[in-house]
Structures are given as structure tokens and as C-alpha cells.
A protein has these predicted regions:
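A helix-coil-helix interface module used to build multimeric assemblies
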Residues: 1-132
């Protein structure tokens, strides 16, 4: 898939650290951070077994995922969360098939995307504040 390039101006207008926050890797990791936090919160109130948290959290590393495949799936799914949550479930099932059923429990795709974006914005604000 051909993407527009910003190579001529990215370094001029944006710091590397800020580009990292809003990169594909940063976006996916932020949504995965939401999924791990959701599992921890749900386990803390007894909604899911505490034994499900470790396999879910372990699978919430962006490096586990094929970004090209995610990009293709996003094009047909209509949003980024649907294929990411499916891939997350498959990754969890490799370690603990029982834990897979608890991933994304009670959450919507919009929850994952919005919460991920807020985590990115938090990181961006910290960079801006540190630079003042």
C-alpha cells in the first residue's frame, strides 16, 4: 500500500519523539495499553479471573503484530480496533486459550480507539511540557 510521505518536512516541523508518539507503532501500542489496563481493572473488581491478566498484558506489545496485515484488515473493517482486537485474541490464545475469551470484555471499538488516542495525547503533552 502506497502512503503519502512526509520525509521532506517531518524532521523540520516535528521532533522525532513526537513523531514516535503518533506513529503506527505508537497508535497500536496505545490501544494495546488500553486493553491491558482494561483487563487489570476488570480483574480488580472480579469481572474476569486474575489469571487472565498476565497473558493479556503479555500480548499487549505492538512488536507482536504484523502492521502490514493490520493495515489491510483496517481497510475492510472500517476502524483500527476491530482487526487489532482480533489479532490480540489470537496472540493471547497462543499462550492461554482460556484468557482469550476475556480480552476486550465489555468494551467497544470506539473505547479502544478513543482511549488509545487519549494516551497518545497524554504522552504528547508531556513532551511539550518538558520542552517549555
Amino acid at each position: 500500500m502506497q502512503r503519502p510521505s512526509n520525509q521532506l518536512f517531518d524532521a523540520y516541523f516535528t521532533a522525532r519523539t513526537m513523531r514516535d508518539v503518533f506513529s503506527d507503532q505508537g497508535r497500536v501500542q496505545a490501544m494495546l495499553d488500553f486493553e491491558a489496563a482494561l483487563a487489570r481493572a476488570e480483574a480488580s473488581i472480579g469481572l474476569i479471573p486474575t489469571t487472565a491478566v498476565a497473558p493479556i498484558a503479555a500480548a499487549c506489545q505492538a512488536g507482536h503484530y504484523d502492521f502490514a496485515a493490520l493495515g489491510e484488515a483496517i481497510a475492510t473493517a472500517g476502524n483500527s480496533a476491530i482487526p487489532l482486537v482480533k489479532a490480540l485474541g489470537k496472540q493471547i490464545a497462543l499462550q492461554d486459550p482460556e484468557a482469550e475469551r476475556y480480552v476486550h470484555l465489555g468494551a467497544t471499538s470506539q473505547d479502544a480507539m478513543d482511549s488509545g488516542l487519549v494516551l497518545q495525547l497524554r504522552d504528547a503533552l508531556q513532551l511539550i511540557e518538558a520542552d517549555l
